[in-house]
A protein has these predicted regions:
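Active-site loop/oxyanion-hole signature of alpha/beta-hydrolase fold enzymes
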Residues: 18, 25, 31-36, 40-45, ...
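Gly/Ala-rich beta-loop-alpha elbow adjacent to hydrolase catalytic centers
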Residues: 121, 125, 129
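An N-terminal hydrophobic leader/cap segment in hydrolases
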Residues: 1-31
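Conserved alpha/beta-hydrolase catalytic His-Asp/Glu region
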Residues: 176-235
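Flexible "cap/lid" loop of the alpha/beta hydrolase fold
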Residues: 134, 142-174
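Conserved catalytic-core motifs of eukaryotic protein kinase domains, centered on the activation segment
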Residues: 63-65, 88-94, 158-161, 250-251
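Conserved loop-alpha-helix segment in the C-terminal half of the alpha/beta-hydrolase fold
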Residues: 236-270, 276-277, 281
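Conserved HGGG/HGGXW glycine-rich cap/lid loop of the alpha/beta-hydrolase fold
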Residues: 41-87
Length: 289
């Protein structure tokens, strides 16, 4: 378990981030070939029908901090760090790719209450949600009841694995403080108003987790999640996409619109992170169904 996440429960600038970090459980999940004593972080908070929330690339569970207060009276929220991301353990000499991410989530589902589960995925987490729902409809029909995707990344296109050396250089570049600050600002519709020390702290906190660069490089080498949206899974799907999204460019948005059709709704005054820029609209969309 990352020391940074333990400290976050009391030391984060953002009070909503502190609440979420304090709700973390450390689960043992029997992933193939890994030490059974490893502990995997997942925040569990609220009461009601279970709802699983999946964060994006090079992020952590803490990105859902503003959405949690709006949903926790209606749902028991399960918010994991995806395998190889956030504050998860990162054993050496291991492949980090989509298959491991899905294996980890399938084991997590076995720990969740029985019955239908809702699923919200943001950015890359949207593609993870689609793949997980499609997988579960074959293994356990009805387990995933519906999906809400927030600016989903990777539904279209094709995998583009980075070769050795370039993957490590890319990870090192993403670790630079100035680069992280720039990406954090780029993710919001109005960074001058929305981004300050609290946002920058959470966007970079997990970089201190041991093995961060190695795992990120190996995930990039795998090609990650790309072109995974067709066919879409059977459960109902809604999609929110920020009108001011500057992370996913126009061609990606157009391809997603062709795939998703009327399921996709544009959100004004919103960048790449609807759950941070417009959490009330995200919660309203989910609770209205």
């Amino acid at each position: 378990m990352s020391d940074a996440l333990t400290r976050a429960a009391t030391q984060l600038i953002d009070p909503q981030g502190r609440v979420l970090a304090a709700a973390v459980r450390r689960l043992q999940l029997p992933l193939h070939g890994l030490d059974a004593d490893l502990r995997w972080p997942v925040a569990v908070i609220g009461s009601g029908q279970p709802l699983l929330l999946l964060h994006g690339f090079d992020s952590s569970m803490l990105e859902f901090r503003r959405l949690v207060p709006l949903l926790q009276d209606h749902h028991e929220l399960w918010i994991p760090d995806l395998f190889g991301f956030g504050f998860t353990p990162r054993p050496e000499a291991l492949d980090y790719g989509p298959q491991r991410v899905l294996e980890h989530l399938e084991l997590l589902l076995q720990q969740m209450p029985p019955g239908p589960i809702g699923l919200i995925g943001a950015s890359m987490g949207g593609s993870v949600a689609v793949v997980l729902a499609r997988h579960m409809q074959e293994k356990q029909p009805g387990r995933i009841s519906r999906l809400l995707l927030l600016a989903p990344a990777g539904l279209t296109g094709r995998p583009m694995p980075l070769p050795p050396l370039l993957d490590r250089l890319g990870a090192a570049f993403l670790g630079l403080p100035a680069v992280r600050r720039g990406l954090c600002r780029q993710a919001f519709a109005d960074p001058d108003a929305a981004v300050g020390p609290a946002e920058e702290e959470i966007a970079s906190l997990h970089v201190s987790t041991p093995g961060w660069g190695q795992a990120l490089a190996r995930f990039a080498r795998s090609g990650g999640f790309a072109g995974v949206g067709d066919p879409l899974p059977e459960p109902p799907i809604e999609v929110l996409w920020g009108a001011q999204d500057r992370i996913l460019r126009a061609p990606q948005k157009q391809a997603a619109q062709q795939l998703l059709g009327e399921r996709l709704v544009l959100v004004d005054d919103c960048g790449h992170l609807p759950h941070l820029d417009q959490p009330e609209q995200v919660a309203k969309t989910w609770l209205a169904a």
